[in-house]
Regions:
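Non-cytosolic coordination micro-motifs
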Residues: 21-61, 91-195
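Broad, structure-driven detector of short, well-ordered beta-strand segments within folded domains
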Residues: 69-83, 153-166
């Protein structure tokens, strides 16, 4: 039953991709890229749930857990530009807390099977394991599959497997929707030391 529900949710979330030129029509818990976070959360809640993950402060990460309107995910993470007083969302993740890396990767593989036909026609990057740049030890990993839309925006399905000695981060499965600009920041700039 849970698998059927997940398939239906993923189909609903991603059904517009084949018709859309960008990702603003895709939603996670009713929230889209380009929406103001203030339409869903109070300024106080946003500020209270803001974290300081990135060395370069171009974007602000926010992690929202267990809000009443969350039906599918345990948490919703999003980012907005640091100077943006409207809190316009440039990335959004639906997060499921799956602590066991083997179970997480099984779920990831099933989601990949389920959504690949929906994302057909977009550039596909094979599933890979990468080192999480925020962990200086190099022991925290991300297993991921990506699709790149024509304008460079991305859809990713990821398992985050954090080293037990790294912070208090929780292993999780994430379905991520990102603008090209934010993805490039996250992968190339966010965890680098300022020059």
């Amino acid at each position: 039953m849970k698998r059927l529900l997940l398939i239906l949710i993923l189909t609903f979330i991603f059904q517009t991709l084949t018709k859309a030129d960008d990702i603003s029509s895709i939603t996670i818990e009713g929230i889209s890229i380009g929406d103001s976070a203030l339409d869903f959360f109070s300024k106080e809640d946003i500020e209270k749930n803001t974290f300081d993950f990135y060395k370069i402060k171009t974007f602000v990460p926010v992690q929202m857990n267990k809000f009443d309107f969350f039906n599918t995910y345990d948490a919703v993470d999003f980012n907005y530009k640091a100077e943006d007083k409207n809190f316009k969302i440039v990335s959004i993740d639906g997060v499921l807390l799956i602590r066991d890396p083997i179970k997480c990767e099984k779920k990831l593989d099933q989601i990949i099977i389920d959504i690949t036909p929906i994302l057909e026609g977009n550039h596909e990057i094979e599933k890979a394991t990468i080192i999480h740049d925020s962990d200086p030890s190099g022991k925290s990993k991300i297993v991921e599959k990506q699709w790149i839309l024509q304008n460079g925006d991305r859809v990713l399905v990821q398992c985050y497997n954090f080293d037990v000695n790294y912070n208090s981060a929780n292993n999780n499965l994430s379905i991520s929707i990102r603008t090209k600009e934010f993805h490039n920041f996250l992968r190339k700039i966010a965890y680098k030391d300022e020059a």
